[in-house]
């Protein structure tokens, strides 16, 4: 099954931002063996057996989160400075414009084209990790037939990050489907996708809701 990149400029930018955070706080080359762990979470809503919307969440590990947040805090108050945050993110996006770190989707050679419905949002998780939320919808002009198996993956072609699902036992939350079929999450150990994780999801037409 062939991998296809989600055609979403917004998602690309937020992914570039997270990878750039790592590049800015660590001196090691981005194009090297893994230096950190990136966790991914997905919520997919189906309509008529097809993916309709996708909500994505990316979480950096604690070491990268701590050093990135230190760059955003006001040295006097200790609070995150809004102006510093905006300048920081803008600079990182420019620096890392050529890095493609994306969540991918594929189904029998057909691309799932996603478009952003809103600007990505930064957040600080309860455990102190730094992350990004994004909401996407399927471009219906490229919608595929129902009943196929969709492969959702989380990977970093630069090999800076090792990818994990936030909840490996239930990597994807599926709604709009009465009885979805999910395969166990798979971690790729070798080859060009080493360090990535993926999961297969299917919503049969007889299960439409």
Predicted features along the sequence, with ranges:
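Bacterial N-terminal signal peptides that target proteins for export
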Residues: 3-18
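Short, well-ordered beta-strand segments enriched in hydrophobic/aromatic residues
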Residues: 51-66, 130-138
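Short N-terminal segments immediately surrounding and downstream of signal-peptide cleavage
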Residues: 31-50
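Short, well-structured hydrophobic secondary-structure segments
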Residues: 85-106
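Mature, soluble, non-transmembrane domains
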Residues: 102-209
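Acidic, glycine-anchored loop motifs typical of Ca2+
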Residues: 71-82
């Amino acid at each position: 099954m062939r991998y296809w990149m989600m055609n979403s400029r917004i998602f690309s930018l937020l992914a570039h931002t997270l990878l750039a955070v790592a590049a800015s706080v660590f001196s090691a080359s981005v194009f090297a063996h893994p230096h950190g762990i990136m966790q991914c979470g997905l919520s997919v809503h189906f309509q008529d057996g097809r993916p309709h919307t996708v909500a994505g969440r990316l979480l950096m590990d604690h070491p990268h989160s701590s050093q990135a947040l230190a760059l955003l805090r006001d040295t006097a108050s200790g609070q995150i400075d809004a102006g510093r945050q905006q300048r920081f993110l803008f600079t990182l996006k420019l620096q890392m414009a050529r890095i493609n770190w994306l969540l991918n989707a594929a189904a029998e050679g057909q691309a799932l084209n996603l478009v952003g419905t809103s600007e990505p949002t930064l957040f600080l998780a309860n455990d102190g990790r730094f992350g990004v939320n994004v909401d996407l919808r399927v471009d219906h002009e490229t919608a595929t037939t129902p009943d196929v198996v969709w492969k959702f993956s989380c990977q970093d072609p630069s090999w800076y990050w090792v990818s994990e699902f936030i909840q490996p036992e239930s990597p994807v939350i599926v709604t709009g489907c009465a009885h979805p079929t999910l395969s166990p999450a798979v971690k790729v150990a070798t080859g060009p996708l080493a360090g990535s994780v993926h999961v297969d999801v299917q919503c049969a037409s007889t299960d439409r809701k």
